[in-house]
Amino acid sequence: MQSMPLLLRQSLRSSANLTRTSRQVRPRFLPAAGPNIYAARDIRRSFSVCVQCQFRSQPTLYLSLEKDKSKDEPVAQQPNDMDPVTTSPHETPKAQPEAEGEHPSSAPAEQETVSRLEEEFKNEPASETTEKRGLPSYLEERRSKYSKQFTEMMDNLQSNVFVAGQRLNDLTGYSSIEALKKDIQVQEERLRTARLRVREAKDSYAAAINRRSASQREVNELLQRKHAWSPADLERFTHLYRNDHTNEVAEMETQEALSAAERESEEAAAQLSKSILSRYHEEQVWSDKIRRMSTWGTWGLMGVNVLLFLIFQIAVEPWRRKRLVKGFEEKVIEAIEKEKTLNHIEILHPQNTLSSTSPASQEEAAETSILTTSEPPAAADETATTTTATTTATTTSEISASEPETTPAAAPKADEPAPVLTLEATEEPAHKNAVTGLLDSCKSQLARIPPPPSAVESWRQTFHDLFSDRSISITQRDLTSVALQSAAAGAAIMGLVIALIRPR
């Protein structure tokens, strides 16, 4: 057997060994499987000054921390009495590099997923809308949406119309009249209640009078047979005499209540009549104001019409006439130029045809030219005057028809230049005379158009034309319409004059 000191010494050694192993096995820092709290600090210590870059790096950092925490939750939930040998301090340096290596790899992956989700979210609505536009469900949904909007609008239409009418009444001053109408309705209800109360007070007063008269009648009957009273008659007499005072007080109270009810009814009737009179007065004032506004509006419209009439007669009508005259002059000048070019073409065309005629025709033309040259001057003058008269009197078509007839006589030979000169000398004055005659006719037609008169002259001419002796033809319908319009205008003017002159 061992001694007690030896046993105590062994027990102390075993306890010391246990305490040493527990102190050596338990680490002072977090286990390797715990969350790496220094990774965020390393990223935050980056020397980037850009705030946007730091902000973009934060979500990935937080996601990595949350992942590490989710991974470490099962390890943290293990029992505290785990085997100390499994968690040695030599394993912590290996686990920390692994955890530190997970953060840089997780950040790009998170950024890629976020960007992919954003692209899908952006591309999804457009594709869905393009696909759904042709579907019956999409059309039905649109129809139901539009029908709901239409029903809401129709439901709000009545309220909107009511609000618009209320605003119009506020502007015209009819809202106060509506308030008076409501006050009159309240006064009528009050008068009705007061009259009902008066009727009830009358009934109660009549009942009190009947009750007191009945008790007095019975008392008088008992007094008439006073010598033959029985004990019951004596008790009845004392009871009636005692109730007589009560009946008298009740009669007085009912009389006062009746007088108060009648007074209240009279006050309600007076207030009602006063409200009715004030409403009638306000309605008269409102109707006068509306009538006056309508009168001024009518006068304003008439003034606008007169102003527009004056503007058109003074400014627009002369401008329109000048424009028409100018346009007509331009058209006439254009027609004259066109006629001039046509005449020039028709005169040059026979000369070209003369150059291509036969020798026999050229000989005949030479003979005719010799004859024309051998004529005396007086005959030449007569022929010139006749030709000018014919050219001015005839049209362009006649000139073109007569020129081919005279062209054979005007074709000279190559060896006779004198007849050619005389033919050209006779054709040019004819062409000039035709052009001058046409110009004179156009000028005479333009001279017939009177110049546009001024505003004062036009008014003077119109006024003189109204009272002139010019004879016109008019139908019975037009005459009847003019008479009716004149009568209506006279009645309207007289009504306006009477409304303005009428004493207020």
Swiss-Prot record:
One of its GO terms (biological process) is inner mitochondrial membrane organization. Residues 502-504 are mitochondrial matrix. GO terms for cellular component: mitochondrial inner membrane. This is Sensitive to high expression protein 9 homolog, mitochondrial. Its main location: mitochondrion. It is a multi-pass membrane protein. Required for the maintenance of the structure of the mitochondrial inner membrane. Involved in mitochondrial morphology. Causes growth arrest when highly overexpressed. The lineage of its organism: Eukaryota, Fungi, Dikarya, Ascomycota, Pezizomycotina. It comes from the Eukaryota. The chain crosses the membrane at residues 296-316, 481-501.
